[in-house]
Amino acid sequence: MSLLWRNKQLRIGLAPDSIYISGAKTVDVAGGDGSWTAPVEALSAALAGRKGEAAVVLADQFVRYSLLAYNETLKTPEQWNALALHRFNTLHGPRAAEWQINVTSTSPLGPRLACAVDRPLIERLATIFTAAGIHLASVQPFLVAAFNRIRKTVGNGSCWIVVEEPGRLTLALIQRGMWIAIRGRRADKGWRNVLPEILERESAFLGLSQPVTRVIVCAQGEFDTAHFSNLYEAWKTEALGYRELALASE
């Protein structure tokens, strides 16, 4: 799943209410409705005076995910993409035809991760970067970028990855190094106080025989791991900054 970035690349993170740019202050985006339109349209001004090549990370709010079980009969990327399109059509209906879908391997015999993004978003990004004279080298979902950054610490272990974005959480479960589930859910500002309950409900929904108590939180604000551990001794929690992960080179 790794996509390597050169250290000299301009790295950009697009969130519903913010634009993160390596070596620069965060750009606040006003008047957005939670869609990608406002941050993307604010991008032209943020790129003024910059050249070279860039890698973009998209907030999970702009991405749909699905895990595809490994199937040895599927040999080519085209076959995997066809399966992914069928899955998204089943889940979301005809609008899936308007999405750009990519499938990536999580491990040699593990499930494939299918990611779908509005095709007009990709096309608009291409237009903006061309007009700015910047080569757009890659576009990557936040969850994928974050996992690539922490995958060595996860190894063949088990953990929850919790990604905080405005009004929502993305929850990804990894067991023994294998991706098991990805779920998105709404969340209010008090989600930190009930995170164990959230994960326990998700575990029950998935029918886990053994609890997974390691949690890696990608937070947009402060996350007090010491306080959390004092309240919930059974949980081992690590916190990473959302902005730092979005802009990190690998």
Where are these regions (language model features)?
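Hydrophobic/aromatic-enriched cytosolic interaction surfaces used to assemble or bind macromolecules
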Residues: 1-250
